[in-house]
Amino acid sequence: MWRIWRCRLSFLFVTGCLLGALTAGLGSQMSDSVGRNVQAPAGVADASQEAGDVVEERTERTEEQVFAPGPPRRHSSESLFPRNPSVTARRRRNRRITLIATAVGVAVILAALYVLRRRRAQPPQEPEPPTRLRTPRPRAPSGQQQPSESEPPAGVPMKPGSLTLPFTCLGDTKVTFFGPSGRQHGFTPLYDPSPSKRVATVDAGANALFIGGGGLNGQFAKTLLEEAEKNGIRLTSVALSEHSQRIQQSLLRRAVKSPGKLVELDTGVASPVFARSFGFVPVVPGLMWKESKVGANVGVTFIHILKPEVTPYGNLNNNVMMYTVAPCGAPPDTTYSLAYKTTIAGVIRAAAAYNDTPAGQQYPVQGLRLPLLRGGIFRRNRSLESIGRANAEGTSLAITQYGPNFELQYMYDPSNAALHGLQEAESTYLASMLD
């Protein structure tokens, strides 16, 4: 989108420059034309002999005037060629046209520069849901399904190197920090091909509550669409975006009526993706902070049990996904810290509440795989260290209060902000125990 705007602004700028140059040249050309008309009035070129006689007569008259008594008379260009009033009016009109056209060209240039400056200063916006239908990819012959760009070939190890540490401040909960994988940019895969336990991966969702767009949210959409295609389910990115948005907005309306409680929605019949869905809000969105500062629907968490047709790798241990909305990095520190800690605590609290439901008893969550929420472009000028600290404080608060019995897995982050934040929280906790 920014490339399109940049092309439009460049075209507008060049057009303004050409307009200013052309109008200035046009005005100069018209002035020269008028000058030529003044220097050669009608009748002079066609009657050269008569002009000579007129000159002689005027010469004699001039001599008489010079030697005649009385005040001297002023000489002007009208003595030989009388000024034509219509020519003078045209000259003035052409000058006005030149000035106006030049002013318009300058105004266009200044407007283009102003819009370009405002566009560059504009903060990054939340990605919009996809609006174009994707052309279905040709399927490989049966038994020879080709690997997609989002998943490496079957022979490439999926699980990246990791570091697992117990944290006393988290009740000795084991936390795994993934290193870079063999995928593009070292990204951690959303799910493993053969997991030993059920791990629910948390999607860093959009404020508009749809699945799709860019970043991790787009990777979730791509994974679900590829699984649907493998199983012959006709599902487009637009349909997935609209359907997920409709389901999650419905869950949100139910959840805000019962803050702090997990609400349930049976989506099995009407949904091509979700067998069952849950919604949770720790507090009513916008009650403890201004949504104009942190963003809409911050703190909400959704849990979806995926249908077998869209479950990654067809493994039942991959059939649970979570979706949450974290704050952007623009608000003041106090507001941001409160919203972020509430969000991450809500994710852990919702997963613990889900395990107490009948569906959770059937498909219990034994681990959470999380990204560093809002650690990308939407953090604005906020440091990754401050996000890591807020994440650690919210996680410690939730585990201390609700004591969930599952491990935490953090996806690869080059800054290691989540690791450093938890290490700092651990040091603070151990120091307080010694006191």
From Swiss-Prot:
Entry keywords, A to Z: Membrane, Signal, Tachyzoite, Transmembrane, Transmembrane helix
Q: Where in the cell is it found?
A: Parasitophorous vacuole membrane
Segments on the Cytoplasmic side according to the record's topology features:
118-435
Signal peptide extent:
1-27
Specify where the region named Disordered lies, as residue ranges: 43-89, 120-162
Q: Where are the transmembrane segments?
A: 97-117
Task: Give residue spans on the Vacuolar membrane side.
Answer: 28-96
Q: Where is the composition biased (Basic and acidic residues)?
A: 55-64
- Free-text function comment from the UniProt entry: During host cell infection by tachyzoites, does not play a role in tethering the parasitophorous vacuole to the host mitochondria.
**Protein name per its UniProtKB record:** Mitochondrial association factor 1 form b0
Species source reads Toxoplasma gondii
